[in-house]
Amino acid sequence: MENYDLYLPTHLIFGRGRIDELPSLLPAKGSRILLAMGGGSIRRISLYDKLRELLSDYEVFDFSGIEPNPKISTIRRAVDLCKAQKIDFIVAAGGGSVIDAVKCIAAGAYYDGDPWDLVLDHSRIGRAIPFCAVLTLSATGSDYDNSGVISNSATNEKMFLAASNSGSDLYLHGAGQSDSSRIGGHHLSHIRAVSR
């Protein structure tokens, strides 16, 4: 057995209806928020409408279409939107792929070059936009760590991203929106906060 240390400075808020606490975890009212999501599951389970209701005091910009094994081309579009709209905070709604993508988007928004550079060289990761995630499916554990997997169709690569150099930014992550691993089960919301 190998020796190791594990440090997860995690604040987990778990329980039925706890998603209503989301606004208390967000920046000041009027902040500019990117709502990042996948292919539509959050609309099918009415999570989108609930999030828009909870975010009604903020200027919200939707970014949908984050695919499984998120592509750097999708991340580039989201980074461009964050820069153009001066996004203050990101809410990731979906599964592990959405969270993985948002980790790269959050760091890419403060990076002057191509976000793929951050995947190739983790030491380039500096500041990042704080974010929270409301997880609809527990599967990958992306909501519990500072890493993810990003794909590049142009180079046929699937690479690991680690955001360990994110400084003192606050990351808010969420976990779980259903009682079961099946989307559409009884709703149970969780919101998790991780500070770095």
Residue ranges, per PLM feature:
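ATP/NTP phosphate-donor binding region
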Residues: 1-89
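Fold-independent oxyanion-binding glycine-rich loops
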Residues: 10, 16-17, 37-39, 66, ...
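Glycine/serine-rich anion-binding loops at beta->alpha junctions
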Residues: 87-105, 136-142
